[in-house]
Curated annotation (Swiss-Prot):
EC number in record: 2.3.2.26
Name of this protein: E3 ubiquitin-protein ligase SopA
Family membership noted in the UniProt record: Belongs to the SopA E3 ligase family.
Cysteine pairings via disulfide bonds: none
Residues at the active site: 753
Name of the gene: sopA
Bilayer-crossing regions: none
Annotated Low complexity bias: 157-171
Main location: secreted
Organism: Salmonella newport (strain SL254)
Taxonomy, superkingdom: Bacteria
Enzyme kind, highest EC tier: transferase
Length: 782
């Protein structure tokens, strides 16, 4: 038998195949013709069984990509192998008598199986870098295990191309990626080919629907070491995923939702990263490069690695664009500085902390030069936009919160442009917050706004006294803010020393009351009376109070005391007993007025006065009773005979036999929405109303030290009696109830001072049902 069409490297053919070929040569006079009639480009394993027979050609599966990516010398060997098998000639018809067609088919199949398996082993090593597995098992082109004899893999360059055909749709790509990451999660070591998803198409894929929840959890599973170069993620959702050591070069992430997505140790160069506006939490970049990548103006770049920019042109985006450099990154800018553009790009206080200002500033301090250069380009753009003061006004706070801090203060260009902006910002703060409380200072405000205000007061020292309401608030928050730096506190303390030395302030601090009692503030305790507010109307009037008192009066609770301060006139302490808090705040210290009124409207004691003293029948008394609730002490007394008689005429019908009439009791329940309330809730309300009327009858309001209006005393006792009937459990004890009752009427030798009774009842209510008391008792009496 002749074997034609070139020599074969028989060193690669098993011994048994050699013997079979020798047998053919010796015993066959007539050869058989066998053809390879088809080479399929399928995913079938290279070691599938061959279909053989005398009249049937040998048919085997060979992926086209394997043929394409063989090295030239291997392609030649492959072609020779195919040609050799094809040209085994039927040269001796006598051979048909000696060897059956079945044996010949088996010999041919064994020859081809062995040679192709060896070539596949070469391919696996070159394509994936994988050495042959133990026991003659290797990984075929479609990543399925195949059995072959172990060979030493040849040394050849490693390629990152896949041997299988590419998926045809985003869904197929997603399925393939899911399979790969799950294998990685299971602990399998993936080859470079397994992790190669270059040129993939993931458009419109929501990854939370294809990955297990563990990939979206905090500190959950990680997608590690994958190659997504030149891939499309447009309109996909990769939120909460963590990509580590991944490559996204030249990929498109336009309108991708990447809320809280983490990119770490990754290559994101030359990427279009204009993620969707629906992204709620910014993605993070940790030790990641973004060279020539187009970034939205609301990104956080705190972990990015910057490099020197090259001479690349700005990226091309649909609709055109304007860009500035931030190191080697491209930041998108508006084409025109319209009102919407100013708000969207600059107002992070209105956009959940996101703006181009915060994006630039988010870089680490080691990139100060790049940050300043980018901010200078931004300022040049704003200056070129010829924006009016009215247009800049809504973003003044955002601008100064960033640009008034280092390293930008080192730039003459930025400082020159920012100066007028900061002055207008400060003037607006003085106008707005001298008479109302500052917003509760969060971390942002403490670290970015308070230092700017300190600097502004330092430049405009006269404002410390003309706007002492704002100035004292700023110092208060600087000294108490947990996120304020030591530098901020030190500067605040130094400024306050200047304030205390001012001629309008110094007369009020040398009275043995201020601070550490020698005229200096004591910042070691919040109980020290360190703060001194000047009256907005009278320079001789001032209010001295502690840190804790000032904080609670600016942000009150129902239990806030509104008289825990010193009122000073010409430096001397004066009594506030007969001063209405609301009038004091309205006239002299308006910074407290809004908070006081807000608490006052929640007190509903006046509703009972309107029931008893209707404005139509008793207009004058109604006003007297309501006015008395606005101050701790009243100069109006109702103990003369005419007043006593008039009050008796009004209250006696409500108290037949000294108890509340059923009709009047129902009126009270209706006024306070207690008709369906529990007996205990009704009793607590009546108890607090009794406390208030006890105060009316005391020497503080309508009584004196020796006398009090009997009708008011009797009405207070009747309210308390009804509360006892409804729920004795709300009282300290039956003995205490009896003692209070005796004191109202002077029975059994009890001391009849209703002021003592009112104070005692008030303390009990504040301890056991404070919310009910706070909803009824007038603020001035609290």
């Amino acid at each position: 038998m002749k074997i034609s069409s070139g020599a074969i490297n028989f060193s690669t053919i098993p011994n048994q195949v050699k013997k079979l070929i020798t047998s053919i040569r010796e015993h066959t006079k007539n050869g058989l013709t066998s053809k390879i009639t088809s080479v399929k480009n399928t995913h079938t394993s290279l070691n599938e069984k061959f279909k053989t027979g005398k009249d049937s050609p040998i048919e085997f599966a060979l992926p086209q990509k394997i043929k394409d990516f063989f090295q030239p010398k291997d392609k030649n060997t492959l072609n020779k192998t195919l040609i050799t098998v094809k040209n085994i000639k039927d040269t001796n018809n006598a051979g048909k008598k000696n060897i059956s067609a079945e044996d010949v088919s088996k010999m041919n199949a064994a020859f081809m199986r062995k040679h192709i398996a060896n070539q596949t082993c070469d391919y696996n090593y070159r394509m994936t870098g994988a050495a042959p597995l133990p026991g003659g098992v290797s990984v075929s082109a479609n990543n399925r295990p195949t059995v072959s004899e172990g060979r030493t893999p040849p040394v050849s360059p490693s390629l990152s191309l896949q041997a299988t055909s590419s998926p045809s749709s985003p869904a197929d790509w997603a399925k393939k990626l899911t399979d790969a990451v799950l294998r990685q999660k299971a602990g399998e070591t993936l080859t470079a080919a397994d992790r190669d998803f270059s040129n993939a198409d993931f458009r419109n894929i929501t990854f939370s629907k294809i990955f297990p929840p563990s990939f979206m959890e905090r500190d959950g599973d990680i997608i590690k070491g994958f190659n997504f170069s030149n891939s499309k993620f447009t309109y996909s959702d990769i939120s909460h995923l963590h990509f580590d050591e991944c490559r996204f070069t030249y990929s498109t992430l336009s309108d991708v939702v990447c809320s809280n997505t983490k990119f770490s140790n990754s290559d994101m160069n030359e990427v279009v990263l204009q993620y969707s506006i629906t992204t709620q939490q910014q993605p993070s970049f940790i030790d990641t490069t973004l060279k020539n990548t187009l970034i939205r103006h609301k990104a956080n770049l705190s972990g990015v690695i910057l490099n020197e920019p090259d001479n690349s042109s700005p990226p091309s985006v649909s609709g055109g664009g304007n860009f500035i450099r931030l190191g080697d990154i491209w930041l998108q800018m508006p084409l025109l500085w319209t009102e919407n553009a100013v708000d969207g790009f600059l107002n992070h206080e209105h956009n959940n902390g996101k703006s181009i200002l915060m994006t630039i500033d988010s870089l680490p301090d080691k990139y100060s030069q790049e940050k300043v250069q980018a901010m200078e380009n931004l300022v040049k753009s704003l200056r070129g936009g010829r924006l009016t003061e009215a247009c800049i006004r809504p973003v003044e706070s955002s601008l100064v919160s960033v640009l008034a801090h280092p390293p930008y203060t080192q730039s003459a260009l930025i400082s020159e442009w920012l100066g007028p902006v900061q002055e207008r910002f400060f003037a607006h703060q003085c106008q707005t917050y001298n008479d109302v409380p500052l917003p509760a200072p969060d971390t942002y405000y403490q670290q970015r706004i308070l230092p700017v205000l300190l600097d502004s007061f330092d430049r405009n020292s006269a404002a410390m006294t003309t706007h002492s309401g704002l100035f004292n608030q700023v110092i208060l928050h600087c000294m108490t803010g947990v996120d304020c730096t030591d530098g901020t506190r030190q500067k605040a303390a130094a400024l306050y020393e200047q304030y205390l030395a001012h001629p309008a302030v110094s007369p009020h601090i040398h009275n043995g009351l201020f601070g550490n009692y020698d005229g200096s503030p004591d910042w070691t305790t919040r109980a020290a009376d360190n703060f001194l507010l000047l009256s907005s109307q009278d320079s001789d009037t001032a209010m001295m109070l502690s840190t804790d008192t000032l904080l609670t009066m600016l942000n009150p609770t129902p239990d806030t005391a509104w008289d825990n301060f010193y009122l000073l006139r010409a430096g001397e302490n004066v009594s506030t007993a007969q001063i209405s808090p609301v009038e004091l705040f309205r006239h002299d210290f308006p910074v407290f007025l809004a908070a006081f009124n807000q608490q006052a409207v929640q007190r509903r004691f006046g509703e009972l006065i309107d029931i008893i003293l209707s404005t139509e029948e008793h207009g004058e008394l109604n006003q007297q009773f309501l006015a008395a609730t606005n101050q701790k002490h009243s100069t109006v007394k109702l103990i003369d005979d005419a007043s006593v008689s008039r009050l008796a005429t009004i209250f006696d019908p409500l108290l037949p036999e000294g108890k509340l009439s059923p009709a009047h009791y129902q009126h009270i329940l209706s006024a306070y929405h207690l008709t369906d309330a529990t007996p205990q809730k009704q009793a607590e309300t009546l108890f607090c109303l009794s406390t208030a009327f006890a105060r009316y009858s005391s020497s503080a309001i309508f009584g004196t030290e020796h006398d009090s209006p009997p009708a008011l005393r009797g009405y207070a006792e009747a309210l308390m009696q009804k509360a006892w009937e409804l729920s004795p459990a709300i009282f300290p004890s039956s003995e205490q109830f009896t003692d209070w009752s005796d004191r109202f009427h002077g029975l059994h030798g009890a001391f009849t001072c209703t002021s003592v009774v009112a104070d005692s009842m008030q303390r009990h209510a504040r301890k056991y049902f404070p919310s009910v008391l706070s909803s009824i008792l007038p603020l001035a009496w609290a």
